[in-house]
Amino acid sequence: MNHIIQDKYIPQQLLYFLAGRRCCQQFPCTFRTSEHEAFANNARSLGLRSQVVHVNGNSCVKVYKQACRHYLEEPKTLVLSSGATLNMFTLLSRKSLMGKEDLELYADLVSMKANASDLPSLHLPLPAIRPPNLRFWTEAQLNFLTAFLGHSLSDEILQSLYASRVIVYNAALCWDKSVFLPLVILDDCRNKKSNVKIMCIERQAILATYNSQRTANFFGEQLGETVGIQLPYFSAVSSSTFIIYSTAQYFLRSLTSQQFRNISHLVVNDVHLHDPYTDILLSEIRMALSSHQNLRVVLLSQMGNPKKFTDFFGEGLQLNMIKQPEVAPRVSYLNELHSCIALAGIHKGPDIYKEIPEAFRANNPRNEQMDKCLQAYGELGTDAALRPFLYAVNYDLAPVNYRHSLTGKTAVHFASELNKANHLRLLLFMGADPYIVDLFQQNAISLAAMNGNHECIDVLNSYSLHGYVVKSAKPDFVDYDLIIDIMYLLRTKPEYSPGEYSPGNILIILPTYYHIVKLNYMILSHCLTGSLQECSIFLLYDNMRNDYLQALVNASDETVKVVLATDIIESLCLKVPFKYQIDTACRLNNVYDTTSCSGDDRFEWVAKDALLRRELILQPNKGDVQCFRLISKEAYEELSETSQPSLQTMQLDKICLAVKLLSPNTIISEYLGITISPPPLINVHHAVQFLKKIDVLDDAEDVTWLGCRLMDIPVSCQLGRMLIFGILLRCLDPILTIVSSLSTADPLGIPFTEDIDNLWDRFTIYIQNSIKKERTYLSDNQFSDHFIFVRLYKEWQNRMHNRTPPLYLKDEYEFMLNGLMEQLTSIRSEIVSSLRAANLIHSRGKLSMNNLNQMSCNWHMVKAALTGGMYPNIYAVDTRKSSLKSAFSGNVSMHPNTVLRDFLEPLNISAQSFRTPWIVCNRQKSHIVYATLVVPLAVAMFSGHPRIRLSPICDSEMSLTDRNVNVFIDEWIWMVMSKATAEMVMRTRYYFFKMYHDLLKHCSELDMWRRDCEPVSQYTVLTDTLSKIFESEDGFVGFFKPPPITFLPTPQLPSLYLLSVNAHFSWAREVEENMLSKPHHFNSHFIERQFFVLYAGGDCEEFHSRNTPAFIESVLGKFVRPIDTPNRHIFVILYRKDPDMMLSISRAKFVNGVFMLQEYFRNNIPVFEILDACVSLNVQTPVFDGRLMSALIDKRVGNLIMELFAFRHHWIHKR
């Protein structure tokens, strides 16, 4: 048998591997040690490399192809500092710690598997089912019911519900099904005196809150009476509750204990969107129908053909109310939009910055390299010469329209001059502009004509037929400039508002919250400068606070509303008539990539069915409406008809965990395979293997104690594991900040070329380098992008501590920072609430918030927690081969975003400054986006499986006299260290993971975590010692001492910043202040503006504290009494001397007869900028000498100053 295995089976398996696509493969540990040599010899004969590795104490053979970059050529060395050795020895010498044999026994016998009876479940307190009380509808309630579009079909709906247990009610959003259906069912059960309990399932908590509140308002009651709600952190249910709203995710968590008892009707909304938890719930409902014969299921949909749902259940009826509208809205696509804007001759944007000198481009290393790329291409003109430039455009974010510093030529100029038509087509496809002129006033067209390059002339003539340049038509680019152009088209051109003045509400659909915040600032800045008609801005996005939604619902009908929304708008039935819709037609989708084993945030075009649903929000039957889609007609025709379900593309870690808690005895792949949208089997396999890797599932696919605790924490399993390590190492606050930052957009992300407005396109490299310098400054030589998150949040937190948010604008970056920090703070609060609900944070004792943050000021402890939490995303630097190696990804590169590398800098140059070869990171596909260098001891201590025994320690093969040993942390992480060091590290590791196990298993036992409890006191000694050890290790490898990270125990941070700012500058506020009795016809060119400059003497705060509004009014009254009307605005500009700075610009107005200054913008702008602008535009220069308290200035100068404040770019003008 041995002969057959060694001579036939092993060579056959290696040949299969050689013919396959894998670059490496691990062969199972069922082979005997004697056969390892056979593997090595056969692999060597086939040109393969092999290595014996250890997995959970068992020897395995791993075989690599020559091109495989996972292979660790040699182990990384671990040498402890003297201070770490002393502290570790002192810790292990304590009598209270277990000995080596006890630790081995502990690792072998203690199971991490949670018993089925111990699995946490949520109890949904459903009162016993009974008939509702007899009551009669009031006239107002009857009018409310008859206003529903489906009221005339009530009898048909009820007959269908009695005829079949499952019905699919298919109707547009305006039918308001999730409120109407429960009321109809309740009324019927009340008349028939039958038992009823209606559970209404939404896909998000904000939808459940909104619909439940509206239903309760119908009864004139509070939530918790007839209508209730069940959410993770808010519950209102009583014995008299008959309609309960919840989310699919929360309801699933209660099924293990509740099993559809005391429910007569289940109404599931938005099934067409295929929310992953809704799809799983449908599987549970299908199984429950066999044992709950009286259960009635109503599926609410908005899709063209809902037959797939009745096919899935094998029974049911369809009520399809979606019909082709009689009057369709006018739909305009990208090409038509550009033509209309070009014909309209819209004039927007700041004049003052259009001719800004390009002094910012000088003495920049990246500019020098880009100049060399263009120069080489101009001299050679070959494909190889163009390739470095294209690399810079595609990977290092250089603009495709980059101009040579001396000649002003772009790559398009050179391609036209050299008659490289294929290069020209490629550059134009990438968004290059052929109309840019160089220093000799030549563009690509004139150069091609001058040199008689007819092939290039044909390409350019074909391109020029459109009469405009389309900047980009990719789903990952949102053209904010085009959206602003459309706003100008709608607000300032009378031909788009025929007849009586009727501006109409505007709905703008954007892919993410980040895009909402950015566009919010751009619209505000254009409105405050008087260029756009004033309006009220409202925001709707996923997981928003209810205050944002109520602000829109309660807004006056006379208010002109501009609503910026994500795709949540497809589920919100709002009583707001929209006249115009601007749809970016794209969405952000997290797609799991099987080749890199990671999720990738990818922007995609939405499907045609989603565009149709958005179009129907306009309700064309109520008047002339128009839809603008920022996608070309050709791209629209190529879109898929229906959206792909999320289960088939997303990362499945939380889904697999939810399935295992629902059905502990079912294999995850089998369960997901019978859902209505089964995911690819390879995705499920990768997710299960990953969960086993990080100890969420054990080898038998059972849920561990870690998995039990992570289920209800609203982050991915890996980020949840990082929170657990933050709790264990008592540095929770910075870990909370890092986890929350990774869950939202990065305010200091390096922007792509297309993400920069047209106005600043020439300064793309300068902007990117400025942001890079800011990241370097915030990292403070810590070689960590995660440290930037902590420091940025702390600096913002210190500025905002116990203060109301500023209700003036500074610049776009500050506005976006405040908006993103608002979202980050909200995510932090939600995570903390979930940790409390999971009993991982207590109100007192060793797990109190104060105690869990005793190490939050120590960055070395935070890095240790990052190492344990980010495992297995650990990379090793191979400086000899200038590559990064990991267990998962082969070809990996560092994204320009990370502080571990500079732009266009090879890895071997960056790695020279690295203090350690180990990197923990967050990655997307083949890019390391955020990384932190960590000491080898942290990798040895916290990576790998929690139950590693001493058996992975093997004698070193370097020499017989060598006293070092090899330690295999997992199948890839391989270290060499002295035998004494190995034993100390492994024993300390065991002691730490004993604490890890005790926390996860016993965190609900409050008595165990009292301050005077003996085992817990030992854990305090452990973390205190670890802090000293890692502090010593950081100094030993050469890390700089980090700046102190302050911990604010009870920060009172401002919330709802964007809501406050938008309300402060809203048109509704003007109406409330009795400024207007009704909207006036608006044309920005006919508004009279007066500008006064006032000498402040100090900063703005000093000026406003020293001078009352009455005094300011008297100063202005020396020239003219400030009378502010809709067509006459008074602005006050504050300035100071030494240094000469303009400080702010405010609007003088009367509120109910009282004079006040409403501050619009505040910034520090050098006076010389306006003086230079006045000279270049031949405008009389104002005097800023400080001798006069106030002065009236030319309105042209005032407009320029206004633009200086409104359109100032933080990174270009930062001083």
From Swiss-Prot:
Pfam families: HA2_C, OB_NTP_bind. Keywords: ANK repeat, Developmental protein, Differentiation, Oogenesis, Phosphoprotein, Spermatogenesis. Gene3D superfamilies: 1.20.120.1080, Ankyrin repeat-containing domain, P-loop containing nucleotide triphosphate hydrolases. ANK repeats lie at residues 407-439. One of its GO terms (biological process) is germ-line stem cell population maintenance. The keyword Phosphoprotein applies. Transmembrane segments: none annotated. Disruption phenotype: Flies exhibit abnormal cysts undergoing transit amplification containing an excess number of cells that do not differentiate into gametes. One of its GO terms (molecular function) is mRNA regulatory element binding translation repressor activity. The modification Phosphothreonine is found at T898. Expressed in testis and in 5-8 germline stem cells of ovaries, immediately adjacent to terminal filament. Expressed in ovarian germline cells throughout the germarium (at protein level). PANTHER family: 3'-5' RNA HELICASE YTHDC2, ATP-DEPENDENT RNA HELICASE. Forms a complex with tut and bam involved in 3'UTR-dependent post-transcriptional repression of several 3'-RNA processing factors, which promotes germline stem cell lineage differentiation and mitosis-to-meiosis transition. Part of a complex with bam involved in 3'-UTR-dependent translational repression of a subset of mRNAs, including those for mei-P26, nanos and shg/E-cadherin; may act as a promiscuous RNA-binding protein tethering bam to its target mRNAs. Required for regulating the progression of gonialblast cells through transit amplification and differentiation into gametes. Part of a complex composed of at least mei-P26, bam, bgcn and Sxl; this complex is involved in translational repression of nanos mRNA. Interacts with bam (via C-terminus); the interaction is direct. Interacts with mei-P26; the interaction is direct and does not require bam. Weakly interacts with wh/wuho; this interaction may be required for the function or formation of the mei-P26-bgcn-bam-Sxl complex. Part of a complex composed of at least tut, bam and bgcn; complex formation does not require RNA. Interacts with tut; the interaction is indirect and is mediated by bam. This is Protein benign gonial cell neoplasm.
